[in-house]
């Protein structure tokens, strides 16, 4: 198996959110990737700038963050042939590695927009290295910037940040420095493609917590009448002593409280 460490840069509507295409709020303009083998040794690179077809001018925020000229964009290939080459380069036996949880979702959203068949496995598990870094070096909840993580690990900063290939280089360097076996069980789940049936629903045990990804429901009432959604249990599977059933906390969030004989209140 190979690791595909990758980073994307994207543009948004230069005329503001009111005029954006709701099917494509962010249009990918650059892909950078490094392939690592099982020993985390580099075996290949992929990099290409992409000519945008929806938002042809760079948003002012994009210009501020990404050192890229309009001329560089206009001389590039478009998304469809680039992403097909990228996926072919990745190969079939690979695990994606990103800094943060957004890149895979945006990659697939762009593929959907251009009607490109999605060959990625389902469910799609990947390494969110930003989360795993926090689990190793912080509280597991904070999210460090890539630049701060590079500084913390003492990695030489020979390249600027905020270009896809450069950020990929640093992400791979962080991965090579980390104690990956200590956190490799904490995979992330891609939510771009949700379960469509009860049989496809995802259950994952991470030892200290569990994750359940349900199929979409037509309404809140339908979701809150489903027995699996309503079930309350600790990840250790011991019978709970007390429970306060699900209640609304506002803004679409629901909370519940249980008392586990081993772990206390959850």
Where are the model-predicted features located?
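Beta-strand initiation motifs
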Residues: 41-44, 117, 121
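Acidic, Mg2+-coordinating catalytic module of metal-dependent nucleases/exonucleases
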Residues: 95-101, 106-111, 145-207
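Short, glycine/acidic-enriched loop or turn micro-motifs at the edges of active sites
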Residues: 10-12, 131, 170
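Active-site flanking residues adjacent to catalytic metal/cofactor-binding acidic residues
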Residues: 6, 127, 166
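Conserved non-catalytic scaffold segment of RNase H-like nuclease domains
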Residues: 2-108, 265
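Conserved beta-strand -> loop -> alpha-helix junction used to position metal-binding or nucleic-acid-contacting
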Residues: 119-133
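Active-site-proximal helix-loop-helix substrate-binding element of RNase H-like nuclease domains
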Residues: 57, 61-63, 70-73, 130-168
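Acidic two-metal-ion nuclease catalytic site recognized across multiple nuclease folds
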Residues: 177-266
